[in-house]
Amino acid sequence: NIISAHNVLISDERINSEKIGLTGISWGSVLTCITAGVDYRFQAFAPVYGSGFLLETPGVKDRDYFTEPDNVEEWIECYDPISYLNYCNRPIMFAIGTNDSFFSPLLQQQSSDLCEGKVYHSYRGNLTHYHRWKDEEGMIFVYDFMEQTLNGKQMPLTVKSEKSDGKNITVEID
């Protein structure tokens, strides 16, 4: 359905096909990650909360509604974003709350390591797992990322590099 919707958008002459990005929240984020590896016509991606390594994800493995598939390898190959993210060559921003109870910042980091394109991260303190959009407490950082990536606007803050000596953290801001 995502690719079909994208086809509808790019067929509309009023829409600039070079400025279409995709975001998804929670399970929509999982679908965003899969799409990032298969539809190169999107110019940017912003998965919020969800990522790959689904069978290791607390929101999947610790819930009663999911039973482990009979053929784990085949299931991962078909349905887990880790099978697709290594083909992602567009800018992608992974966003998650540090206190998210469904998805893991660590697994999101491991998912982002698979991507070929430029990768950004937005780790938010006290961003609980919810689905609000563009407001003061919502997903304004997704809007900022898309504005920067698609329209060249300045990001509020980008960390260029970081290092730690075990006691102190040094961060270089771009």
Features from the language model and the residues they span:
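Conserved alpha/beta-hydrolase "acid-adjacent" motif
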Residues: 101-107
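Surface beta-strand/loop "capping" patches
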Residues: 144-174
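Hydrolase active-site cap/lid region
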Residues: 31-74, 122-126, 130-140
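Short beta-strand immediately N-terminal to the catalytic nucleophile in serine-hydrolase-like folds
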Residues: 22-24, 48, 95
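Active-site nucleophile elbow and catalytic-triad environment of alpha/beta-hydrolase enzymes
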Residues: 70-84
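Short beta-strand/loop motif that positions the catalytic acidic residue
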Residues: 88, 94-96, 100
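Alpha/beta-hydrolase fold nucleophile elbow
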Residues: 14-26
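Alpha/beta-hydrolase active-site loop
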Residues: 1-13, 76
